[in-house]
Each structure stands twice: as C-alpha cells, then as structure tokens.
Amino acid sequence: MNSNRTSSSHNSRNLKILNASFDVPRPPGGGNSPLPSQGRSVRELEEQMSALRKENFNLKLRIYFLEEGQPGARADSSTESLSKQLIDAKIEIATLRKTVDVKMELLKDAARAISHHEELQRKADIDSQAIIDELQEQIHAYQMAESGGQPVENIAKTRKMLRLESEVQRLEEELVNIEARNVAARNELEFMLAERLESLTACEGKIQELAIKNSELVERLEKETASAESSNEAIDSLKVELEACRKENQDLVTSIRTLKHDMKRQVRSMKEAANTMDVQRQSILLLEATIKRKEKSCGSMQKNVLNYEALIAKLNAELETMRQQNVYFRELSENLQQKEVRQLDRGVAIVQPMRMTADAGRFVWQSGTIVAQEPLPLERQSAAATSNVSVSAVRLSSGPPPDQTYPVNGHDRAKYGLLQLFAAKLDWISAVPLALGHLALKIILLAMRLHSCLQNVHIPLRANRDLGAQLADKICELQEAQEKLKERERIHEQACRTIQKLMQKLSSQEKEIKKLNQENEQSANKENDCAKTVISPSSSGRSMSDNEASSQEMSTNLRVRYELKINEQEEKIKQLQTEVKKKTANLQNLVNKELWEKNREVERLTKLLANQQKTLPQISEESAGEADLQQSFTEAEYMRALERNKLLQRKVDVLFQRLADDQQNSAVIGQLRLELQQARTEVETADKWRLECVDVCSVLTNRLEELAGFLNSLLKHKDVLGVLAADRRNAMRKAVDRSLDLSKSLNMTLNITATSLADQSLAQLCNLSEILYTEGDASHKTFNSHEELHAATSMAPTVENLKAENKALKKELEKRRSSEGQRKERRSLPLPSQQFDNQSESEAWSEPDRKVSLARIGLDETSNSLAAPEQAISESESEGRTCATRQDRNRNSERIAQLEEQIAQKDERMLNVQCQMVELDNRYKQEQLRCLDITQQLEQLRAINEALTADLHAIGSHEEERMVELQRQLELKNQQIDQLKLAHSTLTADSQITEMELQALQQQMQEIEQLHADSVETLQSQLQKLKLDAVQQLEEHERLHREALERDWVALTTYQEQAQQLLELQRSLDYHQENEKELKQTLVENELATRALKKQLDESTLQASKAVMERTKAYNDKLQLEKRSEELRLQLEALKEEHQKLLQKRSNSSDVSQSGYTSEEVAVPMGPPSGQATTCKQAAAAVLGQRVNTSSPDLGIESDAGRISSVEVSNAQRAMLKTVEMKTEGSASPKAKSEESTSPDSKSNVATGAATVHDCAKVDLENAELRRKLIRTKRAFEDTYEKLRMANKAKAQVEKDIKNQILKTHNVLRNVRSNMENEL
C-alpha cells in the first residue's frame, strides 16, 4: 500500500483532470477513409488481455485488503487514519482511471485494426478489379486485332481465324487460371477475414467483460468515496458540536468573568462607600463640635438676655420718671418736625407725631428715611412686630449698606436721632424667621430703652451696638448650621441605604457563585462517571461498536480540550486579577492623594482659625472659629468634593468598560455579522444569476431542438430535398440528428442540475416546430423522474418518426419490386422509331460513336445506314432483350443497393435512438426491439436471396459453378444468421446482467438512503438533546435572573446579557440548521455525481454499440463487393457466350466458304462492292485503332462527362444511353420486318457463302460496339468512382467539421458549467 501511495502520489493532484470518458473516436471519413496506422496482431491483443487480467486481479486484491482493513481503521477512527484512507481512495481512483484510459486505448486500437482490415479488403478488391480490367483490355485488344484483318483471301482468313482462336483459347485458359487463383485468394482473404472477425469478436467480448469489471470497480470506488464522504460529514458534525460546546464554554466563562467584574465593582463601590462614610462621619463630628460650640454661645446669649430682662425690669420701674420727660420729648418732636421740613433734600430722619394708637411703636423705611413714633408697651409692641415682619424684611433690604458710619457724638446725635442711628447699624441683617424676628424686635426695643436711659445717664452706646450685631450673626449661623445638618443627615441615610443594597447584592452573588461551583462539580462528576462507563465495556471484554468507540474518543478529546481551555481561562483570570489589583492600587493612590490634599487644606484652615482666635477678643473667638469652620465646609466646597468623587467614579467605570470591551470584542462581532450579511446577499445574487443563466441555456437548447425538429420535418418533404443527392441528403440528416442529440444531452444536463423553469419562453424566440408538428406539449405533465420526462418529451416523437420512415421505405421497396416485372415487359417490347436520312454513309463511317454522342446530348439516333436491311430478327431481338434485361437487372440491383443503404442508415438511426434510450433504464425493451430489427433484416435478406435466385432461374444459368457459389453464399448467410442469433443471445445475457446490476445498484441506493436517514435521525436527536439542554439552561438562567431581579434592581444588566446570550444561541441554532441544509445540498450533489458516472457508463455502452454498427457496416460493404464481383462474373460469362457464338458463326462461315457457293445478291444491300467494303473495313479498323490508342476518340463529347460534377447526372446519362440503344434496336427490327414483307422470295435465293460474309461483318460490328460500350462503361465507372470518392471525401470533411464544431460547443458548455459550479 505504501509503495502504491508513493508511486501514484503525483496523480492525486490531477484527479480533477482525469475523466472516465468512454468516447471511441471513429475515423474521420467513416468507413471509406482508412487509417495510416496498422492494426495489432492477435498475439499482441492476447498479451494485452493477459496484462489487463493481471491488473484487474491486482485491483481486486487491493480492494479485498482494503475491505478487510476497514474494521481496524474504524476502530482506530482518528483523523490521521481517515486522511490516510482518503489518500488511498484517491490513489485507487487515479489507478482505476489509468486502467480505464488504457482500456479505452485498447478499444481505439481495436477500431484501428478493424479499419486496417477494411483497408486490406479494399486493396484486395482493387487488385482483383485491376486484374479483371487487364483481362478485359486484352480481350478487347484481341478482338480489335481480329476485326482489323483484311479478308483478301479465304485461306488467309481461315489461318488468321485459327490463330486467333488458338490465342483466344489460350487466353481463356489463362482467364480460368486467373479466376481460380482469384477465387483461391478470395477464399483465403475471406478465411483471414473470418479469423480476424472472430478474434475481434472475442476481443470485443473481453473488452465488454473488462468494461463491466471496470464499472464494478468504479461502483466500488464510488461506495468507498461515499463512505469517506459520510465519515467526513460525521467529522464535520462532530466539529460543529465541538464548536458549539466551545461557544457554550466561552459564554459560561464570559458570564463568570462578568460576575467577577461585578463582584469587583461592588467591592470597589463598598470601599468607596466606606470612604465616603468615613468622610461623612468626620464632617458630622465637625458639625457636632460646631453645634456644641453654638449651643454654648446660645447659653451665654440667654444669660445675657436674662441680664437684659433684669435691666428692663429696673427700667420699667424708672418709667414713671421718664413720663415726666414727655413734655421735653414733645417739644423736641416739634422741633424735629420743623427741621424735617427744612432738611427734606438732605435725607435726614424725621420723627413724625403719632397718628393712631395701632401704629404706635412701628418703624419702617420710607424713601431712605426712618419714621419713628412713640413707644408702646411690650405686649402691643410685640404684636406690631409680628404683623409687620414682612414689611421690615422687604424694606430693610433696600437700605444703606452696613459699611456706612453714623456719627453719634455732639450735634450729630441731635441731628439724626437715636432710632436712625440704631437702624443704620442693623440694616445689613438678612431676613430671619418669625421667632428670631420677635427676639430681634424685643432686643431692639430693649436697646432703644437702654439707649434712652443711657442718654439720660450720658453713657456711650458703642459696646451695646457691637453686641447686637454679634447676636444677629450668631442667629444666622445657627440657621445655616441646622440646614447643613439636615442635608448631611439625608446624605448619611442615602449612603446607609446604598450600603445595605450592596451588601444584599454581594450576598446574592456569593450564592450564585456557590451554585455555579456546585454545577461545575456536578458536571465534573458526570464526566468522571461517563469516563468510568466508557472504560467499563473495554475492561469487561465486550467488543465496542464504531459509534461507541468514536463517542469514547470524542469524550476523552473533549475532556482534554475542556481542561486545556479551563487552564487557559484560569490563567487569563489570574492575569485580569493582577491587572485589577494594579488598577485598584492606582485608584487607592489617587484617592489617598486627594484625601491628603484635603487634609492639608483642613490643617491650613485650622491654622488660620487659630491665628484669628488669638487676635480676636474673647467675645469674638467663638464666633470666628465657627465662621472659619463654616467657611471650610461650605456648600460649594461640598459640591466640588461630590463632583470630584463622581468624576473618579466615572473614570473607574470607563476603565471597567475598556476591560470589558477588550474581553468581549463586541465591535469585531458586529463587523463580522455585517460581513456575513454581505456574503449572504452576494451568494443570493450569485444564485439568482446562476438560475437566470440556466434559464437562458435551457431556453436556447429548447429552441435548438425546435429548429432541429423543423429541419427534420423539412427533410421529410420530397419537394424540398428532391433535387439533392442521396449522400448530401444523408449528410443533412446526420447533421440534424446530431443537433437533436446535442439539444437532448443539454436538456438532460440541465434537468440533472434540478432547476425548475418557471417560464420556458423568451420574447425574441418563437416556436418553429408548430409549423409542421401539431402535437401537444407534455411540459405541464408531472413525471416521477428526470429520465421519464426526457423520454416523454424527446425520444417518443423521434422513435415514431423513424418507424414511420422505415415503413414508408419498405412500402417503396415492395412497390419497386412489384413494378420491376412490368417495366421489364415494357422495355422488352419494340419501340417505334422514326428513320431520318439526315446523314450520309461517309458521316456514319467517319463517326462511329455518334450514337454515344447523341445519347449523351439527349437526341435520338438518325443515321441507320450501317444497319443491314436483311438482318436476322430473332438474333437481334434476343440480344436486345438480353441487354435490356441485364441493364434492368443492373438498375434494379443499384436501386436495391441504394434502398438497402437507406435502410441501413435508418437502422443506424434506430440503433442510435435505442442507445440513447439506455439512459432510461429500459435495456430489456431495447434488446427486444433490436431482436425485432434483426429478424426484419433477416427476412429482408431472405427476400433478397429469393429474388436473386428467381432472377438466376429466369436467366437460365444452371451451371455447377454458380450453384456452388450460391450454396456458398447461402452457407455464409446461414453463418451470418447464426452469428446474429449468437449476438442476440449475448445481448439478452447482457440485458439480464444489466438488470442484475441495476437491482444491485437500487439495493445499494436503498442502503445508502437508510444510512442517510439513520444519520439524519441521530443528528436530529442530538439537536433535540442540545435544544433541550439549551432550553433547560435558559430556563435555569431565567429563574436565576428572576430571583436576582426580585432581590436587586442592579441585576437587570445581567439579565440583558443573558438575553444577548439567548440571541446568540438562537443564531447558533440557525447556523446549525443552515449547516443541515448545506449537508443536504452536498448529498444531492453526490447523487448527481453518481448519475453522471452512470451516464458515462451508458456512453461507454453506446460506444460499444457504435463499434458493433461499424462492424455491420463492414459486413454490408463486403456484401456489396461480393455483389459487384458476381456482376463482373456475369459479364465475363456473357462475353464468353458471345465469343462462343462468334466462334460457331465463324465455323459456319468457314464451312460455307469451303463449299464454294457464292451469290451476287448478297453484296448489293451492304452498299459498295468488295473493294469499297475493304476500304470501309480498313477505315473502321483505323478508327478502332485510333480509339484504342487515344484515351478519348470524341474529345468534345467525352469532355462533357468531365464537366459534369454530380453523380446523378452520370446516372441520368447512362439511363438515356440505354433508352437510345433500345430505340436503335427497335428501329432495326421494323426494317427487318419491312424487308421480309417486300422481298419474301429473296431469302430462298440467298447463298450460304454470302450469308457467312454478312454474318462476319455483323459480328465484327457488334464486337466493335461491345468494345466501345465496355470502354464507355469502364470510363463511366471510373468517373463515378472518382466522383464518389470526392463526394465521400467532402462528406468526411463535412462530418469532421461538424464533429469539431460539436466538440468545441461541448467544451464551451463544459467550461461554462465548470465556471458556474466554481462560482457557486
């Protein structure tokens, strides 16, 4: 096996080029053109046969060892063993194709040997014809020599006659010897031909056996290739399953990675939340410290308020003293009113008098001036303050800025007033709540009272004003601190909620991780159990099947691959963990840096606060510290910190997204999907284009078939082809048949490609076959197979047409045979002729070939001066009738030969049609039809033999030699019949063998279909299992996702990812379905390939049948040659009879001359006297000598035959010549009757000597005419032979051109088909 692999490894590259084509090339000229190469001997053929048998035995041994070695290979079904088996199968295919090529070369050599034998037979026939022509020329020469003698004296004549008779006898003996030799040579040639034919038949039988064996080997190879393809398909399906498993593993790994990333993100978010909580705790602690400080300050302020209330109580006691001073205040108010009128333009505060009791003690801003009224009691003042808080809050905002200073000392105090100065110090205080407003108003009233008291006591009010401003500031800071505390509490609550959610999410993810680990452990346990179960049958000693062994190997391979993939994924996970650690470290560093910077800022602020506390007095220390803390934790800075945290979170999210994009190449997947869609669209467009091309090709082939049918119908009409010759008609018929076959083969190829044509018509093309054919279309019928459709559409009309043509030809033959007897009788009757005296005797003597010229021109003969008036009626009539019968027989034989050729052509067409019907699996019916055709041919041959025997009996040739020849012919015919019977038996045996082969092929196809169905069922079951597993997995994932969604809203992202996985799984299922469709398409293509191989086998059988047809053609040619030899023999016998008659007449004339009786009455009707007769004889002898010496005595007339180029014109000329001769004979007979009627008494007075003289002259003239006729016929035969040869050459050239054109078109179609297949 290894040696065969190494020897034929170079042939594996050319497997696509090697095609098992069984086309046997015929010679270019048909049966007439011999090949230059010589045939092989029987010994060489036997040696080749022995070598082929050895090769066949070696191939069988190789197949047997391959079949024995298959179970082990199946047990070891690995990829390497399968590849080795594929290589071995390819090598065997190459070797088998080589053997097929060698056997095709043997078939070609056999065809060449047949053509060589035909050439040898043709050469032998030509040599025999040349010998016969030489003998005829010698006879003519002797006859001319006899006719050239001068009858001066009877003694000289007798001597010459004796000498001539001796020479004639000698020549006859030579002729007999030559004929015997020729017969012996022919017998030897026939014996050699019979041996060669037997050897050829044996070789053909062996070749057929080898072809059958080769077909069996090809079938075995197809089976092996089918098994290899099935194994490849199984491997592909397993690869697809592996890829699906890999994808599932990848999906699981990606899901695990995503879960790990989510865990890491959650851990990071927890860390960040913890950091934020720490920061918030620190801020809360700071705020609590500030609140404590402010509570202390509030306590101190309350103490101060209590002190102020005590003072107010003291002052209430002193109110009585103050009432006494009201007079003074009134006077002062009057003065102020007067001054107000004066100082309106200066914007000085004017104290108006009290208008109403309700308005007492209220103060408002009015266009930059303070209007003050008399004070009220505390209760009423507080009510007034509550009712006018909003007005004060709005109006105070439009007052002067707090930086404005108001002098208090001296005249300024009296100028502006106390309330105006106090309000100028409080105008910058912002809006405060109601409680604080009440408090502030109370304080202001107290301050006013204090101011009034202190004015009376003359104490400065600067310190009190500073305390009020500090009090207002503290209140505002308290409000702001409360608001900030509320916001921080809200943020703290949100952070606690997020931390709780994260903790819940972490717990759920930990549970999921535990579940996944448990599932992985369960799957690992299952795999271990499967491995144990796989190991158990091998350990128990049970023989595993191929499927179990393959599943075991697949499980081990899958486990190894899964382990490798898991290791790789763990390494990747470790790498990713290291990267995540690095990135978390970087993030921690960044966060630490930012925290460190913030701590630095806090330290700086604390230092500034410490410095300010040192500089400020004790009263302002607490407020300054609180203000610094408040500045360090303002809302703007808090928002900035939050924004920074958000930015950091965004950066972390971006980094995680980048990592996820690096792992899941979603963009690449999208691009690949787009490319897939583009490729699918391109494939769809290519399929559409291919279907359109197939439609166009099918329509064109249909139109070609219609045109061929149209031409075929035209060929049936006699009006169209009545002018053409038979050979051209046959050539046209063959061309039309070949075009029909080509269109049918194209239709078969298009039907095999399984393309259904919706519309088989184009707008530019019309249906031409409807002109002469009115049969209905069968295109709308439904058929069970392509072969039945092809048979119903194409083969049935051709078979019917051929049968009708055969019946018409048979009817014409019967009519011709029935009308032949009538024609013979009509031609044997004398025809009336008109005698014209247009020529003189000198013209008649100077133009001895005038009859020939007139016959060729088409005129009747008018010069009858050479005919004797007293010619014998009985002899002329008998000779004319014999000539007429011979001519009629020749005509009939030629016509029968033509008809037989036509029948043979039609039979060839029938055989071709039957060979085409082999494609329809009806070989048994074909063999029956061929048997019927053979029986019909036998009946025709028997009828022809009976007609020939009847003709021979009518002629009266009862000689022994003819009987022997007829018996020999009968024996040959019987042998042919036996051979045909043997051929029939062999054909029936072949048909039975083919039926057995068809049954075996059908069984094999059924087995293959069963295997395919089993494989499809297994694949469907596997797919269902995978679908069920996928559905279960999906359900589990959905359940988990639902639980996760119920636990936490963050699990929606994982649910979306699982939905994407679901889509990917559905796409993978679609991909598997597309793979199933592709596998089905490959199955259909394999079936088409098997059909193509069957078609090639059928073509090989067709070529074998063509070889049989060529053999039958050779037999027909042989029969024609035998007929021709028989005709020549008949001519020789007729010449011998005429020569014997001449000898008898001469002997009679010699007897009369010896008696010495003469008469003067005899010489008168001959024309001139004896001297003139001698001159006339000399002139005739000179003319005859010139005729013998020159090739054409009448150049002007002989050249006419050379000008005519068609075979039909020569036939017409021969027919006209024969009719003219009959007319001349008829013209001679009435002359004789008239002479008999005019001179009845002259016969009794004629002397014997004169009669002999006249008889000799007539015999000489008849001999001369016969020689001329023989020469003319010989030349006519030569001309016709040359024309036939040229026509055959032209026909062969036309056939060669047509073949080349068909081959070119076939190659073009093959290239187109290969290009279309490559594009598809």
From Swiss-Prot:
Domain of life, source organism: Eukaryota
Coiled coil residues, start to end: 97-516, 626-654, 712-983
Subcellular location: Cytoplasm; Cytoplasm, Cytoskeleton, Microtubule organizing center, Centrosome; Cytoplasm, Cytoskeleton, Flagellum basal body; Cytoplasm, Cytoskeleton, Microtubule organizing center
Sequence motif Nuclear localization signal, location on chain: 644-656
Cellular component, GO annotation: centriole; centrosome; ciliary basal body; Golgi apparatus; motile cilium; pericentriolar material; perinuclear region of cytoplasm; spindle pole
Listed Polar residues bias regions: 535-554, 831-843, 1237-1247
InterPro entries: Cnn_1N, MT-associated_AKAP9-binding
Keyword Cytoplasm assigned: yes
UniProt xrefs under Pfam families: Cnn_1N
Residues modified as Phosphoserine: 545, 785, 874, 876, 878, 1191, 1234, 1237, 1239
Phenotype seen when the gene is deleted: RNAi-mediated knockdown has no effect on nuclear positioning in fat body cells.
Modified residues (Phosphothreonine): 782
Skewed-composition ranges (Basic and acidic residues): 517-530, 810-823
Gene Ontology BP terms: asymmetric cell division; asymmetric neuroblast division; central nervous system development; centriole replication; centrosome cycle; embryonic cleavage; meiotic cell cycle; midgut development
Subunit structure: Monomer.
Protein's name according to its UniProt entry: Centrosomin
Species this protein is from: Drosophila melanogaster
Gene symbol of the encoding locus: cnn
